[in-house]
Amino acid sequence: MKFFLLLFTIGFCWAQYSPNTQQGRTSIVHLFEWRWVDIALECERYLAPKGFGGVQVSPPNENVAIHNPFRPWWERYQPVSYKLCTRSGNEDEFRNMVTRCNNVGVRIYVDAVINHMSGNAVSAGTSSTCGSYFNPGSRDFPAVPYSGWDFNDGKCKTGSGDIENYNDATQVRDCRLVGLLDLALEKDYVRSKIAEYMNHLIDIGVAGFRLDASKHMWPGDIKAILDKLHNLNSNWFPAGSKPFIYQEVIDLGGEPIKSSDYFGNGRVTEFKYGAKLGTVIRKWNGEKMSYLKNWGEGWGFMPSDRALVFVDNHDNQRGHGAGGASILTFWDARLYKMAVGFMLAHPYGFTRVMSSYRWPRQFQNGNDVNDWVGPPNNNGVIKEVTINPDTTCGNDWVCEHRWRQIRNMVNFRNVVDGQPFTNWYDNGSNQVAFGRGNRGFIVFNNDDWTFSLTLQTGLPAGTYCDVISGDKINGNCTGIKIYVSDDGKAHFSISNSAEDPFIAIHAESKL
């Protein structure tokens, strides 16, 4: 009995770090700005059969409808109420999506905007996605309801009321982030309204939350809110399951607020990951892929079991957030596929794949003046995600998660789950390879010359299908074939001019 109790306690303590994905599913995808009806379809027709574990959805609660500029993506980070009513859909559509995705084993993670309400300069009225009245000037949000008592105006000590100095941890938490009205999260009433919103989502069936702007909330206030949350819906999750929590904290070093301040609440976004990996794959600042041998904690990242990792996110793919120009995105497709491939093959962290939309980039003095542009739309109504005959997406939806190289690496990660990082090779430059136990092996050529070498893969003998150049279909391979001999060795040849200069094989790609 003692042993059982000990296990139970450990299980309980670790609960918020576990993603609640179905057994054998190891990644989630951010379907940025997608409509709930399209996500429900995507769960059924693509994500479930391809082995994706879940979807991070855009904030589902009512937000300001901003018309200047016209309907920017960031309007969704300006809450008006906790009604489930946005451009992505209403509450019925949200419930339908959660049910349909859970029924095929794909989880839903909500981007929860709980640090603040709308900007202080937004005009009073009903320009909101559900028509609720709000008056930022008088701190009046009757659809919640919040009033002047529920904000941090009295606590913030800066002249402007906004955050002015990131070296002052107190103002980062108690003042307004770019003018957004900062909620008084130490008040039990405010905590209760937020918990009520999150519990509504949990009861519908969501599996966890991305906590937006966690750096701007005191870790103790977050904990107090999490302590009020329900267990997950037992229709889909084991009894007693806790929501998966991952907190958005931008910590590139050099500031008093650290990612580690938040480990007690759940996982944390590791922004160093994409910033550093982009620098390495771009070969900037003398970086090379051979240096990736001790990738992860060896690079000064947080512990693997606390990290949520990604190559790019909705902020830094358009120059917001962290990482600057080193961040790789779908605009840099060749290098991007290599970076995502490396991330999905490497055991560090819990992985999130990005799925974007195109927008008309326009650089002036190094800045994209169109970085605000919202999702593909007809006069403000988000466009359907159409699927082309070749399985790519139309209507300016990029759907990186459907690119063969990325989708197949999501499966690679599932196949090698739990296997150690083994058989590292590098040429001292940008040709590297590594295995995952006896289940998978991947080789990269990011040098300006051909790679041709026999390497120890650790895999059983046989013919394998490279899942980067093709697919294993009915026992045949549409891409490059790799022959592993009885001693586990295989010859790899990768031209530096190859469309995708990397090769990946795994136990389930064996012919």
UniProtKB/Swiss-Prot annotation:
<keyword id="KW-0106">Calcium</keyword>
<dbReference type="InterPro" id="IPR006048">
    <property type="entry name" value="A-amylase/branching_C"/>
</dbReference>
<dbReference type="GO" id="GO:0004556">
    <property type="term" value="F:alpha-amylase activity"/>
</dbReference>
<comment type="similarity">
    <text>Belongs to the glycosyl hydrolase 13 family.</text>
</comment>
<keyword id="KW-0868">Chloride</keyword>
<keyword id="KW-0873">Pyrrolidone carboxylic acid</keyword>
<keyword id="KW-0732">Signal</keyword>
<dbReference type="Pfam" id="PF02806">
    <property type="entry name" value="Alpha-amylase_C"/>
</dbReference>
<dbReference type="InterPro" id="IPR006046">
    <property type="entry name" value="Alpha_amylase"/>
</dbReference>
<comment type="subunit">
    <text>Monomer.</text>
</comment>
<dbReference type="InterPro" id="IPR017853">
    <property type="entry name" value="Glycoside_hydrolase_SF"/>
</dbReference>
<feature type="binding site">
    <location>
        <position position="210"/>
    </location>
    <ligand>
        <name>chloride</name>
    </ligand>
</feature>
<dbReference type="GO" id="GO:0046872">
    <property type="term" value="F:metal ion binding"/>
</dbReference>
<feature type="binding site">
    <location>
        <position position="115"/>
    </location>
    <ligand>
        <name>Ca(2+)</name>
    </ligand>
</feature>
<dbReference type="GO" id="GO:0005975">
    <property type="term" value="P:carbohydrate metabolic process"/>
</dbReference>
<dbReference type="InterPro" id="IPR031319">
    <property type="entry name" value="A-amylase_C"/>
</dbReference>
<feature type="site" description="Transition state stabilizer">
    <location>
        <position position="315"/>
    </location>
</feature>
<feature type="binding site">
    <location>
        <position position="313"/>
    </location>
    <ligand>
        <name>chloride</name>
    </ligand>
</feature>
<feature type="binding site">
    <location>
        <position position="216"/>
    </location>
    <ligand>
        <name>Ca(2+)</name>
    </ligand>
</feature>
<keyword id="KW-0479">Metal-binding</keyword>
<keyword id="KW-0119">Carbohydrate metabolism</keyword>
<feature type="active site" description="Nucleophile">
    <location>
        <position position="212"/>
    </location>
</feature>
<feature type="signal peptide">
    <location>
        <begin position="1"/>
        <end position="15"/>
    </location>
</feature>
<dbReference type="InterPro" id="IPR013780">
    <property type="entry name" value="Glyco_hydro_b"/>
</dbReference>
<keyword id="KW-0378">Hydrolase</keyword>
<dbReference type="Pfam" id="PF00128">
    <property type="entry name" value="Alpha-amylase"/>
</dbReference>
<protein>
    <recommendedName>
        <fullName>Alpha-amylase 2B</fullName>
        <ecNumber>3.2.1.1</ecNumber>
    </recommendedName>
</protein>
<feature type="modified residue" description="Pyrrolidone carboxylic acid">
    <location>
        <position position="16"/>
    </location>
</feature>
<feature type="disulfide bond">
    <location>
        <begin position="393"/>
        <end position="399"/>
    </location>
</feature>
<feature type="binding site">
    <location>
        <position position="173"/>
    </location>
    <ligand>
        <name>Ca(2+)</name>
    </ligand>
</feature>
<dbReference type="GO" id="GO:0005615">
    <property type="term" value="C:extracellular space"/>
</dbReference>
<feature type="disulfide bond">
    <location>
        <begin position="43"/>
        <end position="101"/>
    </location>
</feature>
<dbReference type="InterPro" id="IPR006047">
    <property type="entry name" value="Glyco_hydro_13_cat_dom"/>
</dbReference>
<keyword id="KW-0326">Glycosidase</keyword>
<feature type="binding site">
    <location>
        <position position="352"/>
    </location>
    <ligand>
        <name>chloride</name>
    </ligand>
</feature>
<feature type="disulfide bond">
    <location>
        <begin position="465"/>
        <end position="477"/>
    </location>
</feature>
<keyword id="KW-1015">Disulfide bond</keyword>
<dbReference type="GO" id="GO:0070062">
    <property type="term" value="C:extracellular exosome"/>
</dbReference>
<feature type="active site" description="Proton donor">
    <location>
        <position position="248"/>
    </location>
</feature>
<feature type="disulfide bond">
    <location>
        <begin position="85"/>
        <end position="130"/>
    </location>
</feature>
<feature type="disulfide bond">
    <location>
        <begin position="156"/>
        <end position="175"/>
    </location>
</feature>
<feature type="binding site">
    <location>
        <position position="182"/>
    </location>
    <ligand>
        <name>Ca(2+)</name>
    </ligand>
</feature>
